[in-house]
């Protein structure tokens, strides 16, 4: 339990003891503690006096006064109490309790903020999963940044997280990739008789693959068409996936599993789920096609599994894949989908229900569109290539840290304008620079302290920490673990970037209000330990969203 929860629990216990002592109720109702919107109204407030009105048959302000009169303020860490309005009780805490967070942060280091107990739940988090047919773009970048941050947050909150990338290496798009490579392969050999398929891939990378294969494996030209296309499928996917993996690794995004769609066919899992759905009576034949009764589970219409030409729709292997996720022992399935996949939510949930799996175990987040902005105008095409701007170009333009930070600053269900000019600015207007500068500034102060012979663990008396800005800063440090818990519960990576901005802001305010290194050696020791706790918190929070914490800038 974190220090904030401990204090709130103690306050609730002492209020309950006070109610008993005052004889206000035989059975005490639920005591709710809230943080007032206006800090002038205290650190915490409760409406328990009004809740007790009917039970105690007294005026709520009288009840509030009785609670106050019988409260053990020392145990509750309370230095002042006000009764406001019809009977709200506002508590102002003795903030020395907050200083306990300083040695805790220093002792835990990289683990500070992480919960100690496992949730005992396995989470499979699938994100990015871009088709291996071209470069990653800004939409994939947002998916990668949010997905990786969410995996870090859930892990810190005590979940057992598996990060997974689903490789769409089967289906029409891979056939089109193979046909496109075939055309470029023969062109490189001087044979222009092979035309590009209607839905082919015309990117520069396909030309390069064709040339490379023509140089290294010219013998492929003598293969049968079937064998040739099989080879181009395999080599094309390998080439594209190697490039995607390299870009994602540079973007500080890593996966535990790379799950191949082809493996579902090789292990006959698609046939298995199809047979199971038929056995359960959820499929039917109509218009020469095989349908799934998803309307039985709140979908707006039934869905085709097998088309009238005998080929599978994309939906059927998707069902097999998600059923495989369940079979692997995962309690929670989280998918991060692009904005064009909104219609998939109900049908995927319905498909799980056909197997008796609670569809609430599947959570789907839709990543809304990102616009790249420069000088107030949208940038759609790369000036260098004339094509859509790739993740690699974004990394080259603004850097990994800025890209990761900016792409996790907003809720994924909201559209976002990525200001590339702002992301490159070395000023406090740039959110990531502002946060990293706070960390670098702390490192600079700690270096000066060390030169004066003051170590971060030297303090054992924190009573000298009385400055209002210092207290507010410590409150923010103490709020780190609850913020992680909240971000995990709501699957909201942007709660961490919001927290980082607040923490950096509180540090800068403290720094501008009071000197850290002073002639008062005991006060200096306390301040040095405090800012080390802030530094650890800031570094851990930045790491959670995949951003570095530089020691100098």
Curated annotation (Swiss-Prot):
One term under GO cellular component: cytoplasm
Chemical reaction(s) catalysed: tRNA(Arg) + L-arginine + ATP = L-arginyl-tRNA(Arg) + AMP + diphosphate
Location of this chain's protein in the cell: Cytoplasm
Keywords: Aminoacyl-tRNA synthetase, ATP-binding, Cytoplasm, Ligase, Nucleotide-binding, Protein biosynthesis
Chief location bin: cytoplasm
Motif ('HIGH' region): 130-140
EC code(s) of this entry: 6.1.1.19
SUPFAM superfamilies per record: Anticodon-binding domain of a subclass of class I aminoacyl-tRNA synthetases, Arginyl-tRNA synthetase (ArgRS), N-terminal 'additional' domain, Nucleotidylyl transferase
Pfam families per record: Arg_tRNA_synt_N (PF03485), DALR_1 (PF05746), tRNA-synt_1d (PF00750)
Family annotation (Gene3D superfamilies): Arginyl tRNA synthetase N-terminal domain (3.30.1360.70), HUPs (3.40.50.620), Isoleucyl-tRNA Synthetase, Domain 1 (1.10.730.10)
GO molecular function: arginine-tRNA ligase activity; ATP binding
Keyword Iron: no
Superkingdom, natural source: Bacteria
A Gene Ontology BP annotation from the UniProt entry: arginyl-tRNA aminoacylation
Subunit field text: Monomer.
Family according to the record: Belongs to the class-I aminoacyl-tRNA synthetase family.
Protein name: Arginine--tRNA ligase
Gene label: argS
